[in-house]
């Protein structure tokens, strides 16, 4: 009997009839999560969390384990797909005012923070040059915390430098956090289904709802197919497109790479971090670059939920998208002019979106009131 109720919940779940393709990314994220969990499990079977053997175990997986190359590439490219989907998912939430469903938005932002931590721990595991030095630079930011910073850093490292205990605990965290993500995702979906999804118009969908299956389930299946096809095309033809060439060399604490940078999906935050020439200031800006999303439900002043009929906010939104892309590009470049200036300007523009949001909402309300 409970199974029957579960099927009814899936089949007869009422969903607004006018939700567009941008609402498909939630289910695509679920697919990515399932894929990452499965491939990650098979990789963990053959991986060795030891600084002398970690790099060799990755080589062993790709060369000797049957289909190991496929698992390793799917896991690496799948992480990039995960972040592409989540950034589009967040952009849709910002554009269509999904953040007004406070509980869903706050649980989603928490999920993003946990996901970023998981991806960071995973990037360290191959113990390549960039893995080691990215871990050194990012964990070293904890020393910026007043009074307890040094103790915190040593506690995280398990010693006075990044060494074997660090790799062991990062592997343990990388293994356990996805289960936290799965639990949080369930809460996120349950909270969503108490109120239901928003729609492109930003209106109440109650007057025009259709069953999730077969209508939206088929639309989701199409996007799954496109995503999996893209994943396999990248894996087959350009499997190392998202990798850093430095990471094909084993970690060497005595040789510093010319330009230390994290994976591409953290470059926007890294760009904001290095745009401030102060360690504590940069660390605060880095944390704010993600946590500022938490302010969105509380700073919304417009009478309209969606940006569909708000041209001023649309302009700000697309400026944010362009800023995000530019800051990501600038963060791949060395710390020298003009890239430092570009980084600083784009960092200001990034935070400007969140500060202008309540002001433009208030202005649009004034304009609409004078026109009626």
From Swiss-Prot:
Protein residues bound to heme b b562: 75, 174
Recorded GO MF terms: metal ion binding; ubiquinol-cytochrome-c reductase activity
Compartments (UniProt record): Mitochondrion inner membrane
InterPro entries: Cyt_b/b6_C, Cyt_b/b6_C_sf, Cyt_b/b6_N, Cytb/b6-like_sf, Cytochrome_b, Cytochrome_b_C_euk/bac, Cytochrome_b_N_euk/bac, Di-haem_cyt_TM
Disulfide pattern: none
Transmembrane spans: 25-45, 69-90, 105-125, 170-190, 218-238, 280-300, 312-332, 339-358
Residues engaged in binding a ubiquinone: 193
Cofactor: how and how many bound: Binds 2 heme b groups non-covalently.
GO cellular component: mitochondrial inner membrane; respiratory chain complex III
Cofactor: heme b
Domain of life (superkingdom): Eukaryota
Main location as per UniProt: mitochondrion
Membrane topology: Multi-pass membrane protein
Binding of heme b b566, residues: 89, 188
Record text on subunit structure and interactions: The cytochrome bc1 complex contains 3 respiratory subunits (MT-CYB, CYC1 and UQCRFS1), 2 core proteins (UQCRC1 and UQCRC2) and probably 6 low-molecular weight proteins.
Miscellaneous section: Heme 1 (or BL or b562) is low-potential and absorbs at about 562 nm, and heme 2 (or BH or b566) is high-potential and absorbs at about 566 nm.
Role summary: Component of the ubiquinol-cytochrome c reductase complex (complex III or cytochrome b-c1 complex) that is part of the mitochondrial respiratory chain. The b-c1 complex mediates electron transfer from ubiquinol to cytochrome c. Contributes to the generation of a proton gradient across the mitochondrial membrane that is then used for ATP synthesis.
Similarity-based family: Belongs to the cytochrome b family.
Name this polypeptide is given: Cytochrome b
């Amino acid at each position: 009997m409970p199974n029957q109720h579960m099927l009814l919940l899936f089949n007869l779940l009422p969903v607004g009839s006018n939700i567009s393709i941008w609402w498909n990314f939630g289910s695509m994220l679920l697919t990515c999560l399932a894929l990452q969990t499965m491939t990650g499990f098979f990789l963990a079977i053959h991986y060795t969390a030891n600084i002398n053997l970690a790099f060799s175990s990755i080589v062993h997986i790709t060369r000797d384990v049957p289909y190991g190359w496929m698992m390793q590439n799917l896991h690496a490219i799948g992480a990039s797909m995960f972040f592409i989907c989540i950034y589009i998912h967040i952009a849709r939430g910002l554009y269509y005012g999904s953040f007004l469903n406070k509980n869903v938005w706050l649980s989603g932002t928490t999920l993003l923070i946990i996901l970023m931590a998981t991806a960071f721990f995973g990037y360290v595991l191959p113990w390549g040059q960039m893995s080691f030095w990215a871990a050194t630079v990012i964990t070293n930011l904890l020393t910026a915390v007043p009074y307890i910073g040094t103790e915190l850093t040593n506690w995280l490292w398990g010693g006075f430098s990044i060494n074997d205990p660090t790799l062991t605990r990062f592997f343990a965290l990388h293994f356990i956090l996805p289960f936290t993500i799965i639990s949080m995702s369930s809460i996120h979906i349950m909270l969503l289904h108490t109120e239901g999804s928003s729609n492109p118009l930003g209106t109440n969908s109650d007057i025009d709802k259709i069953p999730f299956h077969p209508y939206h389930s088929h639309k989701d299946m199409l996007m799954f197919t496109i995503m999996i096809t893209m994943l396999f095309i990248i894996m087959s033809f350009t499997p190392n497109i998202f990798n850093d060439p430095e990471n094909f060399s084993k970690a060497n604490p005595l040789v510093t790479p010319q330009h230390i940078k994290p994976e591409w999906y953290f470059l926007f935050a890294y760009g904001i971090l290095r745009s401030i020439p102060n360690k504590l200031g940069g660390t605060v800006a880095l944390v704010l670059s993600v946590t500022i999303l938490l302010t969105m439900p509380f700073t919304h002043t417009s009478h309209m939920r969606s940006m569909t009929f708000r041209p001023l906010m649309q302009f700000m939104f697309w400026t944010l998208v362009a800023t995000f892309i530019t800051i990501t590009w600038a963060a791949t470049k060395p710390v020298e002019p003009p890239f430092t200036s570009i980084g600083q300007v784009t960092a200001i523009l990034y935070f400007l979106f969140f500060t202008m949001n309540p002001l433009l909402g208030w202005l649009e309300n004034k304009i609409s009131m004078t026109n009626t």
